[in-house]
Structures are given as C-alpha cells and as structure tokens.
Amino acid sequence: MKKRFEGTKSYVATEDLKVAVNAAVGLERPLLIKGEPGTGKTVLAEEIAKALGAPLIQWHIKSTTKAQQGLYEYDAVARLRDSQLGDQRVHEISNYIVKGKLWEAFDSPVRPVLLIDEIDKADIEFPNDLLLELDRMEFHVYETKETIRAAMRPVVVITSNNEKELPDAFLRRCFFHYIKFP
C-alpha cells in the first residue's frame, strides 16, 4: 500500500491533515484525530480506507467497553453449557474464543484501516491497556497459549471527542491532528 492520502471527492482534507495521515501511514504509528462531534473524524477513517484501497475494520467504543474485548473474549458460560449437554466441541477450547476487532485486523491478509472510534468514551485506563498491543502488533491468548501477530500492520485511526484527557503515555505514541468545526 504505497498510495498517499490526498483527500477524496467526498472529503476535502487540509494540508495539515494530509501530512498527519501520510506520516501515520508511512511511519506505521496510530493517528489520533480529535474534534467536536460532527466534524468528520469517523468519516475520515472511511475515506482513508477508500483512498488506500484497504478494508475498514470499525471498533466503536462505549463507556462499558474494555480493551480485552478488542482482542478476544472467552465464552466460559457457553463451554460449561455445552459440557453439560455432552457437546463434543467442548474439548477444543478455541471453539469458545470470540475474536475482537484487533484480532480481525491482525488476521487481515491485506493491510486494513482499523478505526477505534471515540476512545475517550471508555474508562481512563482503556488507552493504556492497548499500548503493548498497538506497539508490538501482537497479543497472547491465555486460554489457547498462542500468540496472535499482525500479518500486516494495520493503519490505526483513533478518534476522540475530547470528552476526557487521554494518558500521556498513549499520546506520545500517536500522530495527532485536531479537526476544527467548519
């Protein structure tokens, strides 16, 4: 993916925004986009994916979202139920692992754009809980004892409505751009 982002027919980007996007893409660091609601932060990720010819994987964050959900979730209740019903799938623990959006991005055979939308809605520790995974582009699945590594490092676009401050350690790892209200 050697294409550069120059905006699209439906998204007019400022020069500063183009520089931020292309720096993040080229240097493989997350791009943090802040701005008021309705300024086009989420649409920007969609347009970056279109311009680069990349699939878009969207992870919309809520106040209850935990970082672990982006990696995977282990459904122990379903496994217990299946064991009581004599289901043979119970012997393979991977049958009860539900892949999260980061895993989906890491599994992509082509370089995707991963949108982590409205990160500031989550708990204050949420961004720090993703630092290692976003830096190394890998994580460990404890239940199956396997390490999941990104096949292609995704273009990571993170949006924030500036509702709360993000941790300094997280901010230092991102390229940043503020979109002003038109």
Where do the model's predicted regions map?
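Dynamic helix-loop-helix/coil hinge segments at AAA+ ATPase domain boundaries and subdomain interfaces
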Residues: 1-18
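Phosphate-binding P-loop
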Residues: 13-15, 22-28, 36, 105-109
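Walker A/P-loop
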Residues: 31-77
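A short helix-turn-beta junction within AAA+ P-loop NTPase domains corresponding to the substrate/partner-engaging
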Residues: 54-58, 167-182
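Short glycine-rich substrate-engagement loop in P-loop NTPases that contacts/grips substrate
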Residues: 71-109
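AAA+/SF3 P-loop NTPase mechanochemical coupling elements
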Residues: 96-97, 103-111, 141-159
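Conserved AAA+/SF3 P-loop NTPase catalytic/coupling segment centered on the Walker-B
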Residues: 100-101, 106-134, 165-167
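Conserved Walker
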Residues: 119, 136-152, 163-169
